[in-house]
Amino acid sequence: MYKRQVSILNALGMTANGAGGTTLKQMETAAGMSLNQLNEFLYTYRMSLPAAYKNCAVSLANSAWVRDTFRVEDSFLRACVNYYSAEVYRSAFDGSLVTDLNRWVGKETNGLIDSLLEQAPGEATMLYLVNAACFDARWETPYEASDIREGGTFTAASGARQTADYLTSSESIYLSGNNVTGFLKPYDGGKYAFVALLPDEGVTLEDYLKNLTGEHLYQLITGHQYADVQASIPRFTAQTELELEKALTAMGITDLFDVSRADLRAMGSAPSGNNLYVSSVLHKTYLSLDENGTRAAAATSVQVNSGSAQPTDVKTVTLDRPFLYMVVDTHACVPLFMGTVTSME
């Protein structure tokens, strides 16, 4: 389900320009398109983003952070710059890298995510490829004071009953699939929308996510029904930090993380002559939703290391238990942000 998310797709797209052989083929298969198609798609999508759309602001930024002793291939950097508008920084990869990279992420996410790198990397790390995405939008139909129900109950994944304030509204797009129902709530202008998916009673969010695929999400959203939906959304702020190696490996991208199999020679060469491979794909998100709208940000980094081989009736959807949310570009059917809410605390 992660492969369609814009921040992750940008970071992996830059990485793919340094890949070859089976490593590249696995990445192309997971993306569902060739490298050239991926580059063109992400370039075209980024260029289509308006500086401001109605009361919506959306931005995407990319950067490449290169160790000063790493012999990076010019063709790789050209692809990152030409297709992804990546800013390129050379660094000694000491303590200043942590400050500079995190400052860049903070600037590009309007301070919603203030750190991606916790400490200076070891000598084996040659490169970081980073994407930052930011979103700030107002609802198409604002909430009135009478639409806010304070002191409601949310049942957390742990079973604990927690207090939540609910935003109630009538929506017109209903989503329904195997073991899940949901709705789509548009932001001002209609290009972007908040999507909520609530697993059926008796189905945990964890179990639902195990079988969820990008294709299923696409079919769920594009196969929506028009209906009168009585929707209730809790006010919430969610922050997530995910290491995506396991998820990407499950999608068939295996060689990229294997020091003995990864083919990243088109990216450059380490001073030691050791093989390049990806040691980490870190993804952080922040999303805050209230009666005014939504503010969200995401940052994704790919760490490259060197190493020696190793219906029409009224529907009701009340988000009072763990649910999945997305902020979706409804024109391209691309999720900008995705996450889960399992607790109000």
Model regions and ranges:
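Juxtamembrane non-transmembrane segments of integral membrane proteins
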Residues: 214-217
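Extended hydrophobic
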Residues: 129, 181-197, 310-345
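Short glycine-rich loop/turn motifs that provide flexible caps or phosphate-binding loops at active sites
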Residues: 17, 292, 296, 338
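Post-signal peptide N-terminal segment of secreted/secretory-pathway proteins
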Residues: 6-61, 65-68
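Non-catalytic, conformational "gating/processing" segments within enzyme and secreted inhibitor domains
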Residues: 41-202, 207, 222-310
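Conserved small/polar residues in nucleotide/adenosyl-binding loops
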Residues: 1-5
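Short, surface-exposed, charged loop/turn segments at secondary-structure junctions
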Residues: 209-211
